[in-house]
């Protein structure tokens, strides 16, 4: 096999997107985890302007793909299972880093990814934990907001407040904290979005002070829930708002019949990890971020999110 790498590509053709989507499915079936997170899917679909792409082809067959997100400073890449260990991932990684020195995601912490990281002289800089909560039908969850706050559902005129609270809650989070109103609308345009599942906490004046954006999607005909984003205005942190919103979302998703609820959280965020553990969640897998041992001076290696840290 003598693949040819094409790139950087600013805008993918429809055929390219279809072939890469087929590659994603093949890698997911083989590895048990998708090589792209939600942000990566948005980039593949052309819903963002910050992604650059590289494609490895053997003849007409797509055997590898990489994308770099200039806004999040991250790289995601994949190689078709039959084409692995032939230098394709190394070539794609080096091509992407020449343009965007970045952190590279390894979803599921696959052994092959660890080997490649070592070969390229990369170090582990982040761990993103996937936690899960089984949903027995008799599991009680009550939501009790602090005095002066009330639980409500998102309204269209809440969008600016939602974005502002999200930014404040994730101010040290270049990915989640950078969510714009347009980003939020893109997420709300997805098939799974249900306005009833975007729960908010308001003060007595009606101001939004926190939110729990839940997600329910079918997996092989079985509904599965997710704590998609949980954010609280910093002025209300430590008052039980995050836990109350978490419980309200769990109750909402339980009523929809989900079999389990998942979430993603930074491994370094011990306070929030402990909150989720107290609610019954446990770690089921780990995503790892790798970066050059000597990061580029302009690169921000602060706390970032993947497909997104869901924080409280």
Swiss-Prot record:
Where acetyl-CoA 2 binds, per the record, is at 230-232, 237-243, 269-274
Q: Which GO terms describe its molecular function?
A: mycothiol synthase activity
Q: Which UniProt keywords apply?
A: Acyltransferase, Repeat, Transferase
Taken from the record, one Pfam family name reads Acetyltransf_1
Compositionally biased region (Basic and acidic residues): 297-312
Q: Which Gene3D superfamilies match?
A: 3.40.630.30
Q: Which GO terms describe its biological process?
A: mycothiol biosynthetic process
Q: Write the Enzyme Commission number(s) for this entry.
A: 2.3.1.189
Tell me the segments the record calls region Disordered. Answer: 292-312
* Catalysed reactions, as listed in the record: 1D-myo-inositol 2-(L-cysteinylamino)-2-deoxy-alpha-D-glucopyranoside + acetyl-CoA = mycothiol + CoA + H(+)
- Enzyme class, one word? transferase
Q: Which residues bind 1D-myo-inositol 2-(L-cysteinylamino)-2-deoxy-alpha-D-glucopyranoside?
A: 38, 175, 215, 226, 264
Domain of life, per lineage: Bacteria
* Protein residues bound to acetyl-CoA 1: 77-79, 85-90
Domain (N-acetyltransferase) spans 8-136, 149-301
User: InterPro entries recorded for this chain?
Assistant: Acyl_CoA_acyltransferase, Bact_Acetyltransf, GNAT_dom, Mycothiol_AcTrfase
Record has Cell inner membrane as a keyword:
no
Report quaternary structure and partners. Answer: Monomer.
Q: What task does this protein carry out?
A: Catalyzes the transfer of acetyl from acetyl-CoA to desacetylmycothiol (Cys-GlcN-Ins) to form mycothiol.
Q: Which PANTHER family match?
A: AMINOALKYLPHOSPHONATE N-ACETYLTRANSFERASE-RELATED-RELATED (PTHR43877)
Family assignment from sequence similarity: Belongs to the acetyltransferase family. MshD subfamily.
State what protein this is by name.
Mycothiol acetyltransferase
């Amino acid at each position: 096999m003598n693949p040819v790498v094409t790139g950087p590509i600013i805008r993918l053709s429809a055929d390219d997107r279809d072939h890469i989507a087929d590659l994603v499915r093949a890698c997911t079936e083989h590895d048990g985890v998708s090589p792209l997170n939600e942000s990566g899917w948005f980039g593949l679909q052309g819903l963002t302007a910050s992604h650059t792409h590289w494609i490895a082809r053997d003849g007409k067959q797509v055997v590898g793909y990489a994308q770099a997100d200039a806004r999040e400073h991250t790289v995601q890449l994949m190689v078709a299972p039959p084409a692995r260990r032939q230098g394709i991932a190394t070539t794609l990684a080096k091509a992407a880093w020449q343009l965007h020195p970045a952190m590279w995601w390894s979803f599921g912490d696959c052994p092959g990814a660890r080997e490649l990281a070592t070969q390229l002289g990369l170090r582990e800089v982040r761990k993103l934990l996937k936690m899960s909560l089984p949903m027995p039908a008799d599991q009680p969850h009550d939501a009790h907001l602090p005095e002066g706050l009330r639980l409500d559902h998102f309204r269209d005129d809440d969008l600016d407040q939602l974005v502002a609270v999200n930014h404040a809650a994730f101010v040290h989070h270049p990915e989640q904290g950078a969510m714009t109103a347009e980003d939020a609308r893109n997420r709300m345009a997805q098939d799974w979005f249900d306005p009833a599942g975007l729960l908010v906490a308001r003060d007595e004046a009606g101001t939004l002070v926190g939110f729990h954006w839940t997600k329910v999607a079918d997996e092989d005909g079985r509904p599965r829930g997710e704590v998609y984003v949980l954010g609280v205005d910093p002025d209300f942190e430590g008052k039980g708002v995050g836990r109350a919103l978490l419980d309200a979302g769990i109750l909402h998703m339980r009523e929809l019949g989900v079999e389990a609820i998942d979430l993603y959280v930074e491994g370094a965020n011990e306070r929030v990890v402990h909150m989720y553990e107290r609610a019954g969640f446990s770690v089921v897998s780990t995503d790892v971020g790798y970066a050059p041992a000597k990061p580029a001076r302009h690169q921000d290696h602060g706390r970032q999110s993947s497909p997104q840290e869901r924080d409280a």
